[in-house]
Amino acid sequence: MTLLNPYFGKFGGMYVPQILMPALYQLEKNFVDAKKDSNFQKSFFNYLKNYAGRPTPLTLCNNLTNGTKTRIYLKREDLLHGGAHKTNQVLGQAMLAVKMKKKEIIAETGAGQHGVAAAIASALFNLKCKIYMGYKDIKRQSPNVFRMKLMGAEVVSVESGSGTLKDACNEALRDWSRNYQKSHYMIGTAAGPHPYPTIVKEFQKMIGEEAKKQILEQENRLPDAIIACVGGGSNAIGIFSDFIDEDVNLIGVEPAGQGIETGKHGAPLNHGRTGIYFGMKSHLMQSQEGQIEKSWSISAGLDFPSVGPEHSWLNSIHRAKYVSITDIEALEAFQILSKKEGIIPALESSHALAYALKLMYLDPKKEQVFIVNLSGRGDKDIFTVREILKKTEKKHESL
Amino acid sequence: MSRYKKMFQKLSFLKEGCFVPFVVIGDPSLEMSLKIIETLIENGADALELGIPFSDPLADGPIIQKASLRALYKKNTFLQCFELIENIRNKYLHLPIGILLYANLVYNYGIKNFYYQCFRSGLDSVLIADIPIEEYEPFYKIANQYNINSIFICPPDADDSLLSKISLYAKGYIYLLSRPGVTGIEKKTISLSNIFIEKIKKYNSLPLLQGFGIENPTQIQKSILSGTNGVICGSAIIDIIEKNLNKEKKMINEIKNFTSKLKKATKFVQS
């Protein structure tokens, strides 16, 4: 029996081979204990403040919105140690691993942001760290691979399947089912079997709590909308969490990749069906026959064919709205923010920003306040972007 | 009496262990798959465990994963897999046949439609690799309506509460895991302790089949000596398929020899 509800409506659950159930129960019990343990909580917040650098600022973008009546604030998770919101929850999970007396961390990563975070937390807590990463992602995120290795993590290249995050997830689960007695599987997003979606949300909810306090200080009111990108959905659920019961629009932005009509996207909430995969019942990109389909996004961090179960639930009860942004639109937002505000956003976060800009251009005279969760910084993406821009320039020259 | 029950009774009378081979339907093609399965049956398989190919088989190691991908590459449909099963059923009326697959395939097809299809094709059992007993209820109810045995996996570190749950739900046989991890051949020798097996037997009287890592006669004899009723062998057979993809005759010949050798190992008389 679980201590907490494993479901969000009909989504969630624990769909794993039987062998992993004791490890999930152990994790849930330790998580429930940790929530009640004031020493654990104090220590966690101490790491967040004095190691990771919380609270992160809420920045108003004046140049970006010039000539309109929209005010866009960025929740600056890019300024967190490690360069993304991922650091928050890995600190919590590493502390749980220590509490469970596990010696090793297994993790998987797409963009490398969670891999870097897992390597950071493992180094800090003296845990051995093994990170699974698709061979394609290793190529497109080489600076992050180097960072992980510098911090002592072993990066395992996954050659099977499509060689991206989906396959890295499978490999990590396989490793865990062999080594659960000594290893903790540090899932990087609010997805996977219970209790992961609940744990990750708990360890990311400070994003929303801080943002709420900060916007009330700066605007004296709540925003009209919170906008965040959604791959697995951890930064989005983190910033949504404290606004779910408020009168605020919650908007999740999925990657439309090369365009929904091309099939090369990563938007299971709008263009997938409910299914069972990666330990959970949630929305899923799948074929007519129920085989899991490959996803696509310019941003490796959003390149995942499923989504955390709480997002599927928020979508089903129409509490949050999920939209999609193409690679090209995200790239434009990436360049605009860099140029206008001197902030290079992660390609993931650029999707959220692109949607905010879209809303702003749609009705420039409307007075509205948005908070965009700038979930990570874009240093890791500059090479990808440079390559694409080079190709586009060549195309223009030849015209 | 169910086909499993009859088969286990017969083997117990003959003082033999049970040998169950596992292959993935459609690997390397539907046509070859049928030939392979017939070879397995003709050379001593007491029952069959057949895999329905899935894109992300996370309870399986690289050998079975590649087999699934080879099968999927041929774009055979879900229903074509069932046609093959029906084909075998019509030819071998008394042979227990089970399938192993992943939850999304069942869910996508509709749980009720799925079990109806199993019933129509003459299947005896279904094992869903990524559904633990805790999430089994919706599947179990309908499986029972169609008289399909639900097979449960018993890990080597199962505690009393899990053993008692398995004894309540399991039908046909219990799939005993040799070790933690995923399917595949590992160098470490595998044997389950007699004490653990006796403990399981206290909870129920269903036959026990040991799976994961079975590849040679010694392991089979050890398994039966420890108190199991037999073994399931998958990756070692699929390894033969993989190594002989373009040598059909050699592949069938090797499978034939391997199957006879492993079946023979189940025939030693227990003292």
From Swiss-Prot, chain A:
Keywords: Amino-acid biosynthesis, Aromatic amino acid biosynthesis, Lyase, Pyridoxal phosphate, Tryptophan biosynthesis. Transmembrane segments: none annotated. The gene is trpB. One of its GO terms (molecular function) is tryptophan synthase activity. CDD domains: Trp-synth_B. The modification N6-(pyridoxal phosphate)lysine is found at K86. It catalyses: (1S,2R)-1-C-(indol-3-yl)glycerol 3-phosphate + L-serine = D-glyceraldehyde 3-phosphate + L-tryptophan + H2O. It comes from the Bacteria. GO terms for cellular component: cytoplasm. Belongs to the TrpB family. Its cofactor is pyridoxal 5'-phosphate. It comes from Buchnera aphidicola subsp. Schizaphis graminum (strain Sg). Pathway: Amino-acid biosynthesis; L-tryptophan biosynthesis; L-tryptophan from chorismate: step 5/5. Its EC number is 4.2.1.20. It holds the Pfam family PALP. InterPro entries: Trp_synth_b_CS, Trp_synth_beta, Trp_synth_beta/beta-like, TrpB-like_PALP, TrpB-like_PALP_sf. The beta subunit is responsible for the synthesis of L-tryptophan from indole and L-serine. This is Tryptophan synthase beta chain. PANTHER family: TRYPTOPHAN SYNTHASE, TRYPTOPHAN SYNTHASE-RELATED. Tetramer of two alpha and two beta chains.
UniProtKB/Swiss-Prot annotation, chain B:
Pathway: Amino-acid biosynthesis; L-tryptophan biosynthesis; L-tryptophan from chorismate: step 5/5. InterPro entries: Aldolase_TIM, RibuloseP-bd_barrel, Trp_synthase_alpha_AS, Trp_synthase_suA. It comes from the Bacteria. It catalyses: (1S,2R)-1-C-(indol-3-yl)glycerol 3-phosphate + L-serine = D-glyceraldehyde 3-phosphate + L-tryptophan + H2O. It is an enzyme of class 4 (lyase). The keyword Lyase applies. Its EC number is 4.2.1.20. Pfam families: Trp_syntA. The active site is at E49 (proton acceptor), D60 (proton acceptor). The alpha subunit is responsible for the aldol cleavage of indoleglycerol phosphate to indole and glyceraldehyde 3-phosphate. PANTHER family: TRYPTOPHAN SYNTHASE ALPHA CHAIN, CHLOROPLASTIC (PTHR43406:SF1), TRYPTOPHAN SYNTHASE, ALPHA CHAIN (PTHR43406). Tetramer of two alpha and two beta chains. This is Tryptophan synthase alpha chain. It comes from Buchnera aphidicola subsp. Schizaphis graminum (strain Sg). The lineage of its organism: Bacteria, Pseudomonadati, Pseudomonadota, Gammaproteobacteria, Enterobacterales.
